Amino acid sequence: LLVDKPSGISSRDCLDLVRKILNEKKAGHCGTLDPLATGILPISIGEATKFSRYVSNLPKKYNVKILFGLETDTGDITGKEIYKTDAKFSTSELTKVLESFIGIQDQIPPMYSALKRNGKPLYYWARKGISLKRAPRSIEVRDINLKSIKKKEEIELEISCSKGTYIRTLVQSIGKSLHSAATVLELRRTHIGPFNENNSVKLDSSKDFYLKYILGSDEALKIFPKIVLSKEETKKIINGLQVDYNARQEKEGIVRLYEEEGS
């Protein structure tokens, strides 16, 4: 189920509400969104939870509104002010800096995140005023599109990136590269893999409405090649035997296996 998460609640709160409406014990969300953020949040239900990690690993696209000249402890406008500074840079300087962030890079996750440390999420320690050392993680920013400049201090970007990319951290890095500071005003996830916000449903929907829009597990796996097995091959797979289907696959990796129609 592709839910349009509203601002002001956590991804877990969103999941719990959907689980309650559908009366489903087994469910999970694929790809955490910050409480401030809105947008597409895939929720796997029942047996589809087995495929959650594949959806979570899909590339994402975000729209983000940025305020320059301000840095907060959370990296967004909901946090405590750390300091203010000037935002003195030209459009050409901004464009050059944005281009410099496209590509594979290391990023240190923020303290205000759901990553676990010593059995607790990092934000638990951050709220206690404790900063823990975090190992950098490899991410990829595939594209950054400058959508608008409303004021000198406020811009809107469209960012395409890999899983595990923290937009708040990226925004702070952009601010520092411009010899300024930056914080997230608004953040919306518009795409995750083949799914976009037009496929999502509002959170405050009824069970009957949700049931109309629940997708089959297969929809989440269409990024993988499809291979149809013969009756004999199907029997081998069921009995735990190997099947050679390399001739039908262009490269190594995960595939979707289907029974031959009618078998």
Give the positions of each predicted feature.
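Accessory RNA 3′-end/elbow-binding domains used by RNA modification enzymes
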Residues: 1-4, 10-33, 37-40, 92-100, ...
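The conserved catalytic core of RNA pseudouridine synthases
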Residues: 20-24, 42, 132-179
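Glycine/acidic-rich beta-strand-loop module
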Residues: 26-56, 124
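Residue-level signal for inorganic ion chemistry
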Residues: 43, 64, 119, 170, ...
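Structural signature of FAD isoalloxazine-binding scaffolds in flavoprotein oxidoreductases
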Residues: 53-68, 132-146
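Acidic, low-complexity central loop/insert segments
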Residues: 54-106
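Short, structured patches in soluble enzyme cores that scaffold and shape functional sites
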Residues: 66-68, 127, 143-148, 159-163, ...
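Extended alpha-helical targeting/anchoring segments
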Residues: 113, 117-142
